[in-house]
Amino acid sequence: MRASPHVLGIVLAGGEGKRLYPLTADRAKPAVPFGGAYRLIDFVLSNLVNARFLRICVLTQYKSHSLDRHISQNWRLSGLAGEYITPVPAQQRLGPRWYTGSADAIHQSLNLIFDEDPEYIVVFGADHVYRMDPEQMLDFHIESGAAVTVAGIRVPRTEASAFGCIDADDTGRIREFVEKPANPPGTPDDPDAAFVSMGNYIFTTKELIDVIRADADDDHSDHDMGGDIIPRLVADGRAAVYDFNTNLVPGATERDHAYWRDVGTLDAFYDAHMDLVSVHPVFNLYNRRWPIRGESENLAPAKFVNGGSAQESVVGAGSIVSAASVRNSVLSSNVVIDDGAVVEGSVLMPGVRVGRGAVVRHAILDKNVVVGVGEQVGVDIERDRERFNVSAGGVVAVGKGVWI
């Protein structure tokens, strides 16, 4: 049996997330709450920890306080065996400037790699919702002999322009990689589908250091992992693709096998929440064999009183539903729904309060939003456009701490 290779995890968590505004007005995109008990970064960290990759640096930059605090409070490892998950804010090690791209973030953090001296480096994004066993991808990478392995997934061709598109041969060697093309290529067996990058990479350490340094010396580069680093290695014939569909996660159901969602827009973020609420959810939060770990608050259980009810919904700890109706919704912790209120098809983040007789439909309410007595959100869309952000799909998004 082969000894476990020495692996360093680097999580790219500096994203601003402009398309998720107002949810990112006060926090980095990976810190946005999700699913009633988590933040977006919890999915990648859970996948790495479940696979026993226990040396992880999280590179942060944009409005990172809540993200840094969340990692420090909820992701403490023992440290006795050299295990750690540590947030690393931008250090300006190469002069008085911030990260100019994801590749530059690694270039400015090469000291972390030199300190750890790993054989392989797992470079994953921090803002997707999915389960994955990265050890299986590492095995594929080692077997392939490539400098980099890119995790790939099939998506409808109409959606592929938002991603890096991959063309590979039968062995998995990448022949072409185009970042966010206007006219994405279809796959050989399905012209209506495209094979795209998930933003997750595994590098052999020396190869990563060499290509990062070469990119840093290129004045014409945008210093982006998908736009610059991967195409360099593809051009040299040293990049392989790992098919995410072959990844077998313990406890996965037939419905959520190979589930992966980019939640970079309000509509995608909303839709991913709606994947959680059915009797047989598209994405199952209750897989104990591959748990997603999140907030570790000590809260009382959720409570339903005076005939309050919740149907096809996820309700977080500490929440109270009193003589109110909740349907097809996700309620985070410490949410209060008062008498006669109706919440339908909505996402309520921690500390939200919905007053007596109020109605909330097809909406995302950020932390500590208060909906006043008899108020309505998501009922009169034109009125909502005057007050709040409304997505292309008609989802009403109300920013943190707003009183309505």
From Swiss-Prot:
GO biological process, one term: capsule polysaccharide biosynthetic process
Broad enzyme group: transferase
InterPro entries, per database record: ADP-Glc_PPase, ADP_Glu_pyroP_CS, GlgC_bac, GlmU/GlgC-like_hexapep, NTP_transferase_dom, Nucleotide-diphossugar_trans, Trimer_LpxA-like_sf
Keyword terms of this UniProt record: ATP-binding, Carbohydrate metabolism, Glycogen biosynthesis, Glycogen metabolism, Nucleotide-binding, Nucleotidyltransferase, Transferase
Molecular-function GO terms, alphabetical: ATP binding; glucose-1-phosphate adenylyltransferase activity
Ligand binding (alpha-D-glucose 1-phosphate): Y99, G164, E179, K180, S197
Catalytic activity: alpha-D-glucose 1-phosphate + ATP + H(+) = ADP-alpha-D-glucose + diphosphate
Any Pfam family hit: Hexapep_GlmU
Pathway connected to this protein: Capsule biogenesis; capsule polysaccharide biosynthesis; Glycan biosynthesis; glycogen biosynthesis
Lineage: superkingdom: Bacteria
PROSITE patterns in the cross-refs: ADP_GLC_PYROPHOSPH_1, ADP_GLC_PYROPHOSPH_2, ADP_GLC_PYROPHOSPH_3
E.C. no: 2.7.7.27
Protein purpose: Involved in the biosynthesis of ADP-glucose, a building block, required in the biosynthesis of maltose-1-phosphate (M1P) and in the elongation reactions to produce linear alpha-1,4-glucans. Catalyzes the reaction between ATP and alpha-D-glucose 1-phosphate (G1P) to produce pyrophosphate and ADP-Glc.
Family: Belongs to the bacterial/plant glucose-1-phosphate adenylyltransferase family.
Full protein name: Glucose-1-phosphate adenylyltransferase
